[in-house]
């Protein structure tokens, strides 16, 4: 299987790295070798293994009949949407890690994929390395999902863990997170809750069977959490966590993103540092928990590659 990677930033380069590190195992699981033929990027990468694979025009990929799968790791909605739509219309399967794209245009792209007999998969868009999309789509289809509650942002979870363990204040832990590379220079999407808001919108859209607009979800971040709040919670044997939650009420789902004080017996209370966790409740399954590294180059790239392997394995079914 020849594939293309659109975007050679942190995740895109991670995808290429994972495919090389686990080349033999991936080929065995996919049923054939997976080879990166093109990397789409504005930059050149002289002296690197991909220097002869770089292209600057997405149409080169769309018009090449050898390319069966395209990985999108560009980020943002545009031009990612235009490029991905073109790939699907050209009969290419697409795997993406782009939560902004999936939250804003996921329903439309799924329809385009269906109309052209291909797949659009986005396991890496929600929990980084945590497999949650595939279980919801395949393993839990017999269940009525009544609740999804998750710690879906590693940056804020790291910050709250630091505040809890060291008694540090918000500004101090934010700087520490930025120094360690967990938080961006502009941390707004994390600390104001916009990132987990998009992720819970994606998960709710899957279980509801219709697009849930993240802009309609009430969203609060952690900027107002103080050391005093942390002390109060600890005295009550509780932990403060930024939770993204979706609950079935009647025939619809109600979503909320906000800091919660949760009892130390709750499964999510022990999810600390940059780790993420997703708690599910189904009417047949009961309670289930998914836990793992929620961000980072290789965990996220691993989830993207899992989608690529899945699509390669089932390309003729």
Predicted region positions:
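General beta-strand structural signal in soluble alpha/beta enzymes
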Residues: 54-55, 72, 95-97, 120-124, ...
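Rossmann-like NAD(P)H-binding beta-loop-alpha module
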Residues: 67, 114-183, 188-195, 202
């Amino acid at each position: 299987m020849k594939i293309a990677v659109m975007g050679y930033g942190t995740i895109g380069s991670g995808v290429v790295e994972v495919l090389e590190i686990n080349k033999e195992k991936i080929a065995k699981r996919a049923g054939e070798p997976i080879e990166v033929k093109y990397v789409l990027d504005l930059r050149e990468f002289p002296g690197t293994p991909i220097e002869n694979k770089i292209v600057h025009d997405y149409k080169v990929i769309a018009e090449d009949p050898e390319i069966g799968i395209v990985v999108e790791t560009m980020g943002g909605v545009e031009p990612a949407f235009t490029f991905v739509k073109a790939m699907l219309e050209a009969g290419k399967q697409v795997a993406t890690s782009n939560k902004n794209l999936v939250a804003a245009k996921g329903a439309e792209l799924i329809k385009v994929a269906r109309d052209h007999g291909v797949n659009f998969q986005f396991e890496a868009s929600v929990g980084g390395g945590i497999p949650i999309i595939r279980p919801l789509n395949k393993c839990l289809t017999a269940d009525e999902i009544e609740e999804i509650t998750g710690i879906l942002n590693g940056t804020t979870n790291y910050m709250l863990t630091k505040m809890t363990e060291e008694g540090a204040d918000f500004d101090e832990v934010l700087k520490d997170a930025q120094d360690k590379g967990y938080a961006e220079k502009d941390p707004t999407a994390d600390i104001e809750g916009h990132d987990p808001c998009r992720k819970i919108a994606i998960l709710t859209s899957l279980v509801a069977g219709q697009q849930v607009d993240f802009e309609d979800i009430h969203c609060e971040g952690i900027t107002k959490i103080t050391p005093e709040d942390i002390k109060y919670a600890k005295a009550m044997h509780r932990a403060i966590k930024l939770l993204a939650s979706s609950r079935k009420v009647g025939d619809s789902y109600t979503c909320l993103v906000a800091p919660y004080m949760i009892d130390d017996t709750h499964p999510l209370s022990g999810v600390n540092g940059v780790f993420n966790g997703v708690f599910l409740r189904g009417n047949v399954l009961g309670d289930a928990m998914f836990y793992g590294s929620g961000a980072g180059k290789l965990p996220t790239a691993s989830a993207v590659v899992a989608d690529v392997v899945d699509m390669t394995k089932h390309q003729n079914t």
